[in-house]
UniProtKB/Swiss-Prot annotation:
GO CC annotations on file: cytoplasm
PANTHER family, A to Z: TRIGGER FACTOR CHAPERONE AND PEPTIDYL-PROLYL CIS/TRANS ISOMERASE, TRIGGER FACTOR-LIKE PROTEIN TIG, CHLOROPLASTIC
Keyword entries, A-Z: Cell cycle, Cell division, Chaperone, Cytoplasm, Isomerase, Rotamase
Occurrences of domain PPIase FKBP-type (ranges): 173-258
Functional note: Involved in protein export. Acts as a chaperone by maintaining the newly synthesized protein in an open conformation. Functions as a peptidyl-prolyl cis-trans isomerase.
Enzyme Commission code(s) on record: 5.2.1.8
Principal cellular location given in the protein's record: cytoplasm
GO molecular-function terms, A-Z: peptidyl-prolyl cis-trans isomerase activity; protein folding chaperone; ribosome binding
Domains: entry comment: Consists of 3 domains; the N-terminus binds the ribosome, the middle domain has PPIase activity, while the C-terminus has intrinsic chaperone activity on its own.
Native species: Cupriavidus taiwanensis (strain DSM 17343 / BCRC 17206 / CCUG 44338 / CIP 107171 / LMG 19424 / R1) (Ralstonia taiwanensis (strain LMG 19424))
Keyword Nucleotide-binding: no
Name of protein: Trigger factor
């Protein structure tokens, strides 16, 4: 039966589309006429190729295109008329059996969107984390910023950077410059030799045995020592083997951290060099980071709660579409990292199957909960979020214009606000436990979740 949608399973459907051959032939001829005005053939001027030759050359291809175009249009009309919500793209197959002589027919198989049932959210349990930024956290951040701006002085300098003389031994925190050579069974190996090689003792850049051997040396002194490469060492040719190294210390430099003063504040973008303004800006940035992390942690819990509380079948077509999106995202990421030929890199879509299913499932759940409870993002909510984000920039008005000047960026902020609305809605119904943690605990927990 044509035009009747058959139920093949939970989400699978099929409809037979019958199209009169006369309609196909009529549109085919119209397209061939249009094509004849531009087609080029040897021996004829453009637009002067006889219709018989145009039809002989292109007739079969044009008829094929017309058949599928008409099938697609008819499919759209039928599903729209019967209010069927199609998930993904239909698959068309030419139907040969049971077809009238004056028509062509296709079987279109497709999936529909599922019914989404969201259970009792009052049973959901989430933890809402909060963190207070203290003066100690501001001080720690300043220390990190100072270390990022560290510069080194050679041992033995006099004046304000005097350090007790050049005869001191290398200590943790010093930057040392060394020559070294390594041998395995008396033979040098690739990567085992260097001259004027600098590194900072205690940073862990070198293997522990190498750093330990360098500690305590004075300029000009050498030491020979055994070094066992770990079995999982990145250099496969030496992994699991023991080498004999000789290291010679050529220079020792001590770390000089900048003072926290007007010049330091100006280096961080504080125009008037106010240390108090610098501290206030650092506190504000830390509070913004706290808001971002705590919101992300809460959102993840809410999404998991929604997944557990909801029942639905997920259309395979939507999963496959999302897998392809994730593949393209992976290729773009590799391209941005400088990977050669990233655009053509073969990335199997199957590796994203679970991630895609989860994303699609959450998307369907969110759409249902937003629609059922009127949680759409309002214009004033979007504006408020953009204004809050813009505060961290020197020219907030320019940031506002940047957002409102691009529909894609605006859509991303709308999605963020919509997610916030869902998170707040679920938290109002769920069992929420408030938990205070230090900034250090917050960052450690957030990093653990990302890992």
């Amino acid at each position: 039966m044509s035009n009747v949608i058959e139920n093949l399973g939970k989400l699978d459907r099929k409809v037979t589309l019958a199209i009169p051959k006369a309609e196909v032939e009529k549109e085919k001829q119209e397209r061939l006429v249009r094509l004849s005005k531009t087609v080029k053939m040897s021996g004829f001027r453009p637009g002067k190729v006889p219709m018989k030759m145009v039809e002989k050359q292109y007739g079969q291809q044009v008829e094929f295109e017309v058949r599928f175009d008409k099938a697609a249009r008819k499919f759209f009309d039928i599903t729209k008329e019967q209010d069927v919500k199609v998930a993904g793209q239909p698959k068309f197959e030419i139907k040969n059996e049971g077809v009238g002589e004056d028509e062509v027919a296709f079987d279109a198989t497709f999936e529909v969107y599922p019914e989404v049932t969201i259970g009792d959210l009052s049973a959901a349990e989430v933890t809402r984390t909060s963190t207070e930024i203290t003066d100690a956290e501001v001080d720690k951040t300043i220390d990190i910023l100072r270390k990022q701006r560290v510069h080194y002085h050679a041992r033995g300098e006099s004046g304000e950077h005097g350090d007790g003389g050049a005869d001191v031994t290398a200590q943790n925190g010093d930057r040392v410059t060394v020559d070294f050579v390594g041998k395995i069974d008396g033979v040098e190996f690739a990567g085992g030799k260097a001259e004027d090689f600098p590194f900072v003792l205690g940073e862990g850049r070198m293997l522990p045995e190498f750093e330990q051997a360098t500690l305590g040396l004075k300029v000009g002194e050498s030491k020979t020592f055994p070094l066992a490469f770990p079995a999982d060492y990145h250099g496969k040719e030496v992994a699991g083997k023991t080498a004999e190294f000789t290291v010679t210390l050529k220079k020792v430099e001590w770390a000089h951290l900048p003072e926290v003063n007007e010049a330091f504040a100006k280096s961080l973008g504080i125009a008037d060099g106010s240390v108090e303004k610098m501290r206030a800006d650092i506190r504000e940035n830390l509070e913004r980071e706290v808001k971002r992390r705590t919101h992300a942690m809460l959102k993840d819990q809410v999404m998991e709660a929604l997944l557990k509380a909801s029942e639905l079948d997920v259309p395979k077509a939507l999963i496959e579409q999302d897998q392809e999106r994730l593949v393209e995202m992976a290729r773009r990421d590799l391209e941005q990292r400088g990977m050669p030929n990233a655009k053509d890199m073969p990335i199997p879509a199957e590796m994203f199957a679970q991630q895609a299913e989860r994303r699609v499932k959450l998307g369907l759940i969110l759409a249902e909960i937003v629609k059922a409870n009127g949680l759409e993002a309002k214009a004033d909510q979007i504006k408020a979020e953009i204004e809050d984000f813009a505060k961290s920039y020197e020219d907030p008005k320019e940031v506002m214009r940047w957002y409102y000047g691009d529909q894609q960026r605006l859509a991303e902020m709308e999605a963020y606000v919509l997610e916030n609305n869902v998170v707040n809605f679920v938290c109002d119904k769920a069992k929420v436990t408030d938990k205070k943690v230090s900034f250090e605990e917050l960052t450690a927990e957030g990093n653990a979740q990302q890992a």
